[in-house]
């Protein structure tokens, strides 16, 4: 996909690149029915459109105060960070909560300037080697968070492609969790309903006095 998108940023070329990027993305996912494969394809498409090194889905819960990277796509040679970032301290990202509520993008273009206003956020991204970032929020039913691209090199002032990808991602997240809910209901039928708790944040768990079942346990059965 990246080889098919022009580097120039004039309005006409940017519009052409946008439509081309969407066409390539649609063609690559047209016959895909697996939700996780679709999310991976959307992340890849977003990263390639913006010339980014990495794209990820961050699900956030400010009541719990944590965020979790649930899906990630990395360019060849770029290390994955998903396993390292499974409990993001969301108190370090107050402006992200504001962006989610207002349905506005999050942009990092200058870490030094960001550090003057949001030092904790700047320190976090500096630690993980991210110098610039573009993120679009999503919020639907039980899912809320962001789709983000790290170190984008083009179209950084135009988040439309990322917003469209985020809308598609949240649809697939809802589909995944709906399927997990059906599986959970089947598994939970052998427990007393008053004794179980089902948690969907950052995955799926059935918690009871007899122990905990995860989404991976259910898939294995």
Predicted regions and their residues:
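Intrinsically disordered, low-complexity protein-interaction/activation regions
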Residues: 178-221
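A short, aliphatic-rich beta-strand micro-motif
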Residues: 131-139
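Helix-loop-beta substructure at the N-terminus of cytosolic sensory domains
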Residues: 28-70, 81, 176-180
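Signal-transmission linkers at sensory-effector interfaces
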Residues: 1-37, 175
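Regulatory sensory and allosteric helical modules in signal-transduction proteins
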Residues: 77-116, 120-126, 134
């Amino acid at each position: 996909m990246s080889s098919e998108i022009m580097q120039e940023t004039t309005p006409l070329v940017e519009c052409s690149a946008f439509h081309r990027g969407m066409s390539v993305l649609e063609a690559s996912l047209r016959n895909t029915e697996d939700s996780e494969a679709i999310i991976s394809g959307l992340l890849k498409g977003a990263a390639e459109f913006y010339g980014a090194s990495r794209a990820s889905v961050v699900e956030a819960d400010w009541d719990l105060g944590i965020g979790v990277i649930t899906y990630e796509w990395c360019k060849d040679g770029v290390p994955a960070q998903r396993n390292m970032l499974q409990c993001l301290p969301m108190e370090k990202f107050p402006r992200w909560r504001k962006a989610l509520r207002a349905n506005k993008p999050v942009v990092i273009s200058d870490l030094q300037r960001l550090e003057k206003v949001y030092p904790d956020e700047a320190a976090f991204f500096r630690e993980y080697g991210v110098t610039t970032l573009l993120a679009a929020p999503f919020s639907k039913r039980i899912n809320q968070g962001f789709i983000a691209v790290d170190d984008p090199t083009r179209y950084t002032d135009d988040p439309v492609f990322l917003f469209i990808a985020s809308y598609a991602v949240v649809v697939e997240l809802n589909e995944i969790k709906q399927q997990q809910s059906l599986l959970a209901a089947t598994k939970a039928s052998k427990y007393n309903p008053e004794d179980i708790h089902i948690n969907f944040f950052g995955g799926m768990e059935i918690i009871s006095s007899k122990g905990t079942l995860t989404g991976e346990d259910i898939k294995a059965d």
